[in-house]
Regions:
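Conserved "landmark" site that anchors the functional core of diverse proteins
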Residues: 1-288
């Protein structure tokens, strides 16, 4: 996440260090020692002991003080980074929590009420801010433009189905999580490759012999597009006509259920340029 990386940079951590991801509403955290923190992403109206504090800035919270986050005024997810980082073990090279498998993070689960979170030590500075022109712009009208690259199975849709996918506004279902974002929208039409195939591919036009799925692949389960995000399956028997590039994942993470996605087709080269730009701005160059 764009915001996640910037939050870590503000408190002097490496961009990949562990931080807290808060979805829709935030926690109340009482600190047992002084720490520098940064809050980035959706605006959950953060307060320390009842006094509002800014986003996109490194701030000091003292021993005995309480940080409180409310519901998201903008966006869907807020990231809290701590100087010295959350102390957690690597699992397959990551400190992220995979809830459904109960692995990673701290005890393989979401933070529980009353739980203590161990933090490291550092000499981070307060008052560091993210430049205004590199803060991600969170949609305030409930519609998100999401870039997609065609493939790997775009040739299973006919011309009408292909264009319908790009022209439609797709509604994000509440039944969405870090495994997949399910969408509601118009029916899509298929070409002969999908409708006149050998039986081993399956009955539905969107069925295919099991194949590998790219992260960000838009899996077409019958007539339901599902964007396979960070904890999604790595293979299955549905076609993937389009793929969301990694540089657009931050938008997915800030979208709330019942908001809309409008897809914009880009080239592989454009997707690579987006990722390079995002990597560039998620660096010390973006801090003042």
């Amino acid at each position: 996440s764009w915001s996640f990386r910037l939050a870590n940079l503000l408190v002097g951590n490496k961009v990949e260090e562990a931080a807290l991801e808060c979805q829709y509403t935030g926690p109340s955290l009482k600190f047992e020692s002084d720490h520098v923190i940064a809050i980035c992403g959706g605006d959950m109206q953060p307060k320390i002991d009842g006094t509002a504090v800014p986003l996109w800035e490194s701030i000091l919270i003292k021993k005995g003080q309480t940080l409180e986050l409310s519901f998201c005024l903008t966006g869907a997810r807020t990231y809290i980074a701590f100087s010295g980082s959350i102390q957690s073990e690597l699992w397959l090279g990551s400190k992220s929590t995979f809830h459904k498998a109960a692995v990673g993070g701290i005890d393989g689960r979401a933070i529980q009420e009353g739980q203590k979170i161990s933090l490291g030590n550092s000499n981070s500075k307060i008052g560091k801010k993210i430049k205004a022109d590199v803060i991600p712009e969170i949609s305030n009208n409930g519609v998100w433009e999401i870039e997609v690259v065609r493939g790997p199975n775009d040739d299973w849709l006919d011309n009408n189905g292909y264009q319908t996918f790009l022209d439609a506004k797709w509604k994000l279902q509440a039944r969405s999580d870090r495994t997949g974002f399910r969408l509601d929208g118009p029916l899509l039409s298929f070409n002969e490759k999908a409708t006149n195939k050998s039986p081993e591919h399956g009955y539905e036009p969107s069925n295919i012999i099991d194949q590998g799925y790219p992260i960000g692949g838009i899996n077409l389960a019958g007539q339901t597009p599902i964007i396979l995000v960070n904890d999604g399956p790595s293979m299955g028997g549905f076609i993937v006509p389009f793929t969301v590039p990694s540089a657009s994942f931050w938008k997915l993470g800030q979208a709330k259920p019942s908001e809309y996605f409008k897809f914009k087709e880009i080239s592989v080269e454009e997707a690579q340029d987006m990722r390079s730009y995002q990597t560039l701005i998620c660096s010390e160059e973006s801090i003042i």
